[in-house]
């Protein structure tokens, strides 16, 4: 009989996008409870040890974090299994480096370095808009933030630009055709394109038709779409290598051969 939350995570059951090898142990770091879901997050220990190679093991990661060198969205974090997720800004003060967690077209979190100016803000997808106690309006974003007194024009599925120093909304983008979006779930995870058409299905899932920079069109659920810019070629955040354009296997092969001069 289960009593309370699980405290362990087997390595084979861990999300594949963490890219942990099977033979390095039985267990994987289980993310703490936090702003992102377990399968949509990346524990800081995996980011520092496996991706950046700044530590050899978990003990070294703990030593780095207990010296308050690591910040997520402008706040010092000392929990090695803190779940960082999509659009989070990770700052390493000792090396003066800033990273934003965004997906590449392979569906994995890219190690994407950003400037100090870009690290001052993040984008958040509005999940719901409601009235609280005493009629105070508020919005809830994809990373669990509750922001009171938003602009009355903001609706669900819009994207807000959040100042990390104050936690307030600086600007927002309406969800509409012609907007630049990134896909955050499903088989098209990490692809970037422009909204062409929205299909409404009563009692089902709304679908969004998206066209990428190579004029390829694909369809995904509305819940997987995250607006990142007002129009094509003008994202509000910098994109990782590949710019969210997914190539076929043959196209990848041809590009690789061209780089090798074959």
From Swiss-Prot:
- Stored PANTHER family: 30S/40S RIBOSOMAL PROTEIN S4, SMALL RIBOSOMAL SUBUNIT PROTEIN ES4
Q: Which domain of life is it from?
A: Eukaryota
| Chief localisation class | cytoplasm
Its quaternary organisation is: Component of the small ribosomal subunit. Mature ribosomes consist of a small (40S) and a large (60S) subunit. The 40S subunit contains about 32 different proteins and 1 molecule of RNA (18S). The 60S subunit contains 45 different proteins and 3 molecules of RNA (25S, 5.8S and 5S).
What PROSITE patterns does the annotation carry?
Answer: RIBOSOMAL_S4E, S4
Q: What are the alphabetically sorted keywords of the record?
A: Cytoplasm, Ribonucleoprotein, Ribosomal protein, RNA-binding, rRNA-binding
Q: Name one GO biological process term.
A: translation
Gene source species:
Candida albicans (strain SC5314 / ATCC MYA-2876) (Yeast)
Q: Which family does it belong to?
A: Belongs to the eukaryotic ribosomal protein eS4 family.
The segment(s) forming the KOW domain are 178-211
Q: List the disulfide bonds.
A: none
Q: What does this protein do?
A: Component of the ribosome, a large ribonucleoprotein complex responsible for the synthesis of proteins in the cell. The small ribosomal subunit (SSU) binds messenger RNAs (mRNAs) and translates the encoded message by selecting cognate aminoacyl-transfer RNA (tRNA) molecules. The large subunit (LSU) contains the ribosomal catalytic site termed the peptidyl transferase center (PTC), which catalyzes the formation of peptide bonds, thereby polymerizing the amino acids delivered by tRNAs into a polypeptide chain.
In terms of InterPro entries, this protein maps to: KOW, Rib_uL2_dom2, Ribosomal_eS4, Ribosomal_eS4_C, Ribosomal_eS4_central_region, Ribosomal_eS4_central_sf, Ribosomal_eS4_KOW, Ribosomal_eS4_N
Q: Know the name of this protein?
A: Small ribosomal subunit protein eS4
Where does the S4 RNA-binding domain lie?
Answer: 42-105
Q: Give the GO cellular component terms, alphabetically.
A: cytosolic small ribosomal subunit
Gene coding for it: RPS42
Report the GO molecular function annotations: RNA binding; rRNA binding; structural constituent of ribosome
Q: Where in the cell is it found?
A: Cytoplasm
